Amino acid sequence: MSEFEHLRHKPPAILDRPREIVIACAPMKSNINLSRIVRVAGCCAITRVIACGNAQLDKKIARDGADTVQIEVRRTLPPVLKELKADGYRLVGLEQTTGSANLHEYQFERRTALVIGNERTGLTEDLLVLLDATVEIPVWGLPYSYNVASATTMAIYEYCKQFSRG
């Protein structure tokens, strides 16, 4: 008998307080990417995702995240980002820029809006000018960037690691 027993689903960890991170997504080409982001948000007890454009979830991919995450669909991101900033959120873009901080060295503020760009164009200039900071994930091989859902997952995980109790 192995010392490890497979557990299909462990109960979720209990947080001391709700997470204060919002995921704000530019219009995406693929509903699969948005659905993957919502699934990860649900797993990490993030309750709010803002999606722009013709966003639709694939519930088979988003799974329980489709039921536990509040998804707001907006036409464009700039007005949303201005609202979040007025509500005290620090606007952090996930993008490779000349001033990007390394994700592994960046200290998130508890009240963060993580701004995610389009799969092809990333964060456009009208969004970049509104941000307080940008973070990027080191790439050690090719291609030169990660899939948007994979990169968002890594950034969410880093935030949750820094605020492990909520």
Regions found by a protein language model. Give the residues of each.
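Post-transcriptional modification and biogenesis factors for structured RNAs
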Residues: 1-166
